A protein has these predicted regions:
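Short beta-strand micro-motifs enriched in acidic
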Residues: 49-53
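Negatively charged, low-complexity tracts enriched in Asp/Glu with abundant Ser/Thr
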Residues: 1-41, 63-80
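Amphipathic alpha-helical binding modules
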Residues: 75-97
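Short, surface-exposed beta-strand/strand-loop-strand elements in extracellular ectodomains
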Residues: 57-63
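Hydrophobic residues embedded in beta-strands of well-ordered beta-sheets
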Residues: 35, 55-56
Length: 97
């Protein structure tokens, strides 16, 4: 998946997170075809990293506690799978913070 598509999916699906000034920044990976998106707010800081072979890593830390609230690795083969995982897993956990 291209980084711009991933960035749009994240912004579209994270809009309901009660975060002030949600910022998403693209970071080019050192390994070919890898990249990450850093996602920062007042409530959490995090990243979604894409590795070759459709492998994603999701890592979010609470700003209030400094503890990991999400640290998951997942193979997602389509945009639909990514959207569902963001809504049903990542977004749900962030809203529970």
């Amino acid at each position: 998946m291209e980084a711009k598509n991933l960035e749009k999916i994240i912004k579209d699906n994270m809009e309901f997170v009660p975060a002030s000034n949600l910022k998403v920044n693209y970071v080019e990976g050192k390994i070919s075809d890898s990249y990450s998106l850093n996602i920062d707010s007042k409530e959490f800081i995090g990243s979604i990293t894409f590795w070759p072979s459709n492998n994603y890593e999701f890592h979010f830390i609470s700003c209030a506690t400094g503890k990991n609230v999400i640290l998951e690795e997942k193979i997602l083969l389509s945009e639909v799978e990514l959207k569902e995982f963001l809504k049903n897993t990542i977004l749900k956990k962030l809203l529970e913070m």
